[in-house]
Amino acid sequence: MSLLVTSLQPQTKGARAFLARGTQRMLIGGEWRSAVSGETLDTLNPATGEVLGRIPAGAEADVDQAVAAARRAFDDPSWRDLTPSARSRLLWRMAELLEANLDELAELESLDNGKPLWVGKYAEIPGAIEQFRYFAGEAMRIEGTTIPTSINYQPAGKKIFAYTAKEPIGVVGAIVPWNSPIVLTAMKIAPALAAGCTMVLKPAEDTSLTAIRLAELMVEAGFPPGVFNLVTGLGERAGAALAAHAGVDKIAFTGSTEVGKLILDAARGNLKKLTLELGGKSPAVVLDDADLELAIPGVANAIFFNSGQVCVAGSRLYVQRKIFDKVVAGVGEYARGLKLGHGLDPSTQLGPVVSRLQADRIAGYVAAGRREGATVVTGGGQLGPAGTFIEPTVIVDVKPAMQVVREEIFGPVVVATPFDDLNEVTTLANDTDYGLAASVWTSNLSSAHRLASAFRAGTVWINCHSMFDASLPIGGMKQSGWGRDSGHQAVDNYLETKTVCAVI
């Protein structure tokens, strides 16, 4: 299969003007700066390999400046004493600005990440908007409690009055990945600022453009200088410096389990708090009573959406034996019908993966599966002028110990396995180091809820997959992470509980 990809240009004036700058800057303490070293990194369009522009190659010195700015802002009364309703208005204003610039942001995300324009326009940027709106409300719901105690040794005639107060944890370092940049960034920023923290954001070096544009909107929204800071650069330099920094009180990270473990090690120096949303190898389970007109495209989209670059992607497909061949054939047919192309082409259904490095990694997994005896039913090719397109791939004849079954591929590759009964599929689904998500496809609600209870996963969808909302917690069990993003409890990730006990 060949693939012709033409270079397409953004249609919005905002995106064209943004790219025309060539070299971008970082935001530190309310000022736009180059890296201390003066070094830059090229940022590429993964569909074509063309250079879109340059970003500062921030490193330890830049992180030091950003953390210092965030600490000053945290201690400054202009932010520290801001009322909850005032913080709420700032977050709501940010949502309005994202909405007003949605088309521009969608084009920048498509060019920088490769994803089809419609993914940003109708899914991810609206998702980011809703994060800011939701946590604008949560900013006014932070409260402590009064506590009746059983203390009985206070002075005669005195009483005990005890209560808890919730206080912002301090300076937060947020490190976000390249697969869904703007919505994952919003999932860190919105609850942290709702809680009253300040932040240093380190976006992925492959996809920093929308983070820079978002930083501009943060300034326009009216956040005080230093409340939000942006440092771009390589993960092993800027990201590592942020994770280890003694002036950072908390790290909020989304990314691979391997990097999550490195961040855990780096945080030891000052025992900073962590939330980690990490990798997954999520099962999609189809029972023989499922509505296959719903289930077949559902499980196909569970893995092929965003070229499989989704932490909760349904990358392990388990199908009851009676319907296994029919479902695999249907998913294969669906895969072959998907149109690959440039993200700005409105007919594109599947864009490239984020980089040649990632494409080579995915292709390596497919080759490993073949070597171990698996059968590629459809797909498996690596295409395009930059070698960054991966054909949607369906693999069968797999065994539980194979690499393609056990390891997170993070591409449009699904491995399919038959099963006989609920006990067997429970064992198969839970036979993983991960525990991020799962889905069950069935017309029997008893079976659905029995499996939902049995699966060791942070989220279980029934007759759907990858349904997100700002109100719904997302996070994993086992090696898929610590803590939860989204939902009202996400604000607690950024709060300390103080106990006050008084004799009155």
Spans of model-derived segments:
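Structural signal for hydrophobic packing residues in well-ordered secondary-structure cores
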Residues: 74, 78, 95-102, 106, ...
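Short, well-ordered beta-strand elements within core beta-sheets of diverse protein domains
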Residues: 51-58, 75-79, 173-174, 284-287, ...
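Conserved C-terminal structural/oligomerization subdomain of aldehyde/semialdehyde dehydrogenase
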Residues: 50-53, 248, 285, 339-340, ...
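Residue-level signal for inorganic ion chemistry
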Residues: 49, 87, 109, 132, ...
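Hydrophobic face of amphipathic alpha-helices that form TPR/SEL1-like repeat modules
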Residues: 1-48, 73, 134
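ALDH superfamily catalytic-core signature
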Residues: 250, 258-399, 428, 462
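Rossmann-like NAD(P) dinucleotide-binding subdomain of oxidoreductase/dehydrogenase enzymes
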Residues: 143-294, 318, 419
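Glycine-rich loop-to-alpha-helix module at the N-terminal edge of alpha/beta enzyme cores
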Residues: 52-143
